[in-house]
Amino acid sequence: MLRTIKSPIKVIVRPASASASANAEKLDEIRERLAKGPSFQDFIQNPNNTKNEWDNYDGKLRREKVEEQRLRLPPWLKTTIPMGKNYAKIKDQLRELKLSTVCEEARCPNIGECWGGGEHGTQTATIMLMGDTCTRGCRFCSVKTARAPPPLDENEPVNTAKAVASWGLDYIVLTSVDRDDLSDGGSKHIAQTVKEIKARNQNIFVECLVPDFRGDLECVKTIANCGLDVYAHNIETVEKLTPFVRDRRAHYRQTLKVLSEAKRFNPNLITKSSIMLGLGETDAEVEQTMLDLREVGVECLTLGQYMQPTKKHLKVIEYVTPEKFKHWEERGNQLGFLYTASGPLVRSSYKAGEFFITSILANRKKQNDAPK
């Protein structure tokens, strides 16, 4: 339960010693900083917010590299508190089956909408396979890291399939942590999960957001040919920033190679990637990244605002405006992406795109099933 303290905090200063006086001054300083900083309400969506209020927002949107102060959250990034029957139902089932989701581990701002159903009334959860601990330490990600995570749960593929079947979904997203400690990077485990899901429902569309498997093309082939419909692998940021944003084992060109080879192994796949904005990239660099993705055949692209998950992670350099995100959506369409989802709260697994991708896949299935 959240409790609001209406009366100001009273500080009693006893003139006992110099240290007591110093402590009082320190406390006053903290109170002043709290008064000027964001409150809990700053992170909750205001239903009365309108586009005009966004246009009139005069807060600072870009931080210089020498500045230590974090930027204040602009109104278009405020979201609602997750709640509702659907949200509680999915959360309880995940706990019961000991499954992890990237929705929780990565602190996704859309968790309330996706799990609760949102305006479309469709529940969507992105299940994170192979545990909640990653062998890599990307500087933007809040997922736990370790050199040797716990061993894989051999029951996870079946448990995941059971959960998906009970939800009655048309589209499911599977993602995973990186498991560089495993010889195959966990590719066979992911592939088995897809097969278990498809065995229970052949009509469900499965998207896998997978690691780069250290560039091992046999692992990429295993995933590409396991029966999934959408092969997703995120490029995350522009080439120049990659060494500073992603783990040192992740490489820009390696990501492009993985996406290219996945398409070569299975031309019927839809390939998908994602770019975070607000890390200090230039427009020219974003444009080049989009061109690079199109060159290797990527068909679906998402662009969203990077948001610092904790104080230990990279600070936001810039809050990109909704208008700028709209520009990138239009540019993506011009470059030939089948689908471009671009917005401040858009994430690689955001369900908004799944409705469109489902339509593409359904049409392809009809064409393939039609008598020749």
Curated annotation (Swiss-Prot):
EC nos: 2.8.1.8
Binding site for [4Fe-4S] cluster 2: 134, 138, 141
Domain Radical SAM core residue range list: 119-338
Family: Belongs to the radical SAM superfamily. Lipoyl synthase family.
Record keyword Repressor present: no
Record-linked PROSITE patterns: RADICAL_SAM
One GO MF term attached to the UniProt entry: metal ion binding
The organism of origin for this protein: Drosophila willistoni
Keyword Iron-sulfur listed: yes
Catalytic activity field: [[Fe-S] cluster scaffold protein carrying a second [4Fe-4S](2+) cluster] + N(6)-octanoyl-L-lysyl-[protein] + 2 oxidized [2Fe-2S]-[ferredoxin] + 2 S-adenosyl-L-methionine + 4 H(+) = [[Fe-S] cluster scaffold protein] + N(6)-[(R)-dihydrolipoyl]-L-lysyl-[protein] + 4 Fe(3+) + 2 hydrogen sulfide + 2 5'-deoxyadenosine + 2 L-methionine + 2 reduced [2Fe-2S]-[ferredoxin]
Binding site for [4Fe-4S] cluster 1: 103, 108, 114, 349
Pathway listed: Protein modification; protein lipoylation via endogenous pathway; protein N(6)-(lipoyl)lysine from octanoyl-[acyl-carrier-protein]: step 2/2
Primary localisation category: mitochondrion
Key words, A-Z: 4Fe-4S, Iron, Iron-sulfur, Metal-binding, Mitochondrion, S-adenosyl-L-methionine, Transferase
Names of the cofactor(s): [4Fe-4S] cluster
Signal sequence segment: none
InterPro entries: Aldolase_TIM, Elp3/MiaA/NifB-like_rSAM, LIAS_N, Lipoyl_synth, rSAM
Cofactor note: Binds 2 [4Fe-4S] clusters per subunit. One cluster is coordinated with 3 cysteines and an exchangeable S-adenosyl-L-methionine.
Name of protein: Lipoyl synthase, mitochondrial
One GO term describing the cellular component: mitochondrion
